[in-house]
């Protein structure tokens, strides 16, 4: 391959062939979707001008934001563990951290982290880090998003919004029956967001009477699916792109959407067994309190 022309060769022998069309030999080329590790695939040694995407019948130039997002996504270590310069323990909402630590101890009663001070706890969790080469330290992207104060989050991630809309039982003159968004009444970090929306999402779900031995089981497969969908929306979001973590509760179902494209092809997701978290540290923070699993 001429690396001066194209950045990566993703074609295999099976992607090229020929066929007979009305007596004429036609060469066909199937261009597969590139693995996230190789994106963006670009030409002429210029990713900003040489990256294209196929939208149905045409190829389009990728925007600068799309190119940057692909470079960030190429890392296997995720995008939420980087040190945020200038963001310190002063930017942590202590009430959020206290609530999380109580829940953490409930799920991990014998864990040694329960007895360490807040900064060390956050460092072990991946929410706080120290650059060993420069000795600079501070919150990671995961730490600020999960436990940060509203103002600090807006200063660094003003490109991201969180929005919950309940569109059930609406009247002709209303667009929603309940809404949770930025209004200054709550610290809009990810922990507060998920803890506020989950009860709202499952409040109307039926809980058939079930027993596990002599203990009533209130959790159902639907409850678990809704929780998993909400957590997946958060841990797979691209917080470096502009967009909304949006949750809609409708009469006939739920809608979860987030900024960013899929790291894996849709076919691979449906096949199962393929799992790449965009924000593994945030994922682990939820897993440690019983929300979501590492697959």
Where are the model-predicted features located?
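Divalent-cation
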Residues: 1-46, 55
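Active-site "cap" helix and flanking loop/linker of ATP-utilizing ligase/carboxylase catalytic domains
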Residues: 278-285
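Beta-strand-connecting loop/turn residues
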Residues: 23-25, 243, 252
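Active-site helix-to-loop segments that bind/position phosphate- or nucleotide-bearing substrates
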Residues: 34, 50-241, 249-277, 290-295
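Short beta-strand motif preference
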Residues: 27-29, 247, 256
């Amino acid at each position: 391959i001429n690396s001066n022309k194209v950045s990566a060769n993703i074609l295999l022998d099976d992607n090229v062939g020929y066929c007979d069309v009305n007596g004429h030999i036609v060469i066909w080329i199937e261009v597969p979707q590139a693995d996230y590790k190789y994106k963006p695939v670009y030409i002429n040694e210029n990713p900003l001008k040489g990256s294209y995407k196929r939208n149905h019948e045409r190829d389009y130039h990728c925007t600068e934001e799309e190119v940057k997002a692909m470079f960030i996504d190429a890392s296997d270590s995720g995008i939420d563990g980087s040190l945020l310069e200038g963001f310190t323990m002063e930017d942590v909402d202590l009430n959020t951290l206290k609530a999380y630590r109580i829940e953490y101890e409930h799920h991990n009663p014998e864990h040694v982290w329960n007895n360490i001070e807040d900064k060390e706890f956050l460092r072990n969790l991946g929410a706080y880090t120290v650059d060993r080469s420069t000795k600079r330290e501070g919150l990671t992207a995961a730490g600020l998003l999960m436990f940060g104060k509203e103002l600090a989050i807006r200063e660094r991630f003003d490109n991201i919004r969180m929005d919950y809309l309940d569109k059930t039982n609406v009247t002709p003159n209303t667009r929603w029956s309940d809404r949770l968004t930025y209004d200054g009444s709550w610290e809009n970090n990810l922990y507060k967001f998920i803890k506020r929306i989950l009860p709202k999402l499952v409040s109307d779900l039926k809980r058939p009477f079930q027993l596990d031995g002599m203990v009533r089981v209130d959790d159902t497969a639907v409850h678990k699916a809704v929780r998993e969908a909400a957590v997946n929306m958060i841990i797979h979001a691209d917080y470096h792109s502009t967009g909304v973590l949006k949750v809609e509760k409708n009469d006939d179902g739920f809608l979860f959407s987030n900024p960013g494209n899929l790291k894996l092809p849709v076919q691979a997701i449906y096949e199962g067994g393929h799992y790449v978290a965009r924000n593994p540290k945030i994922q682990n923070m939820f897993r440690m309190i019983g929300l979501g699993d590492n697959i």
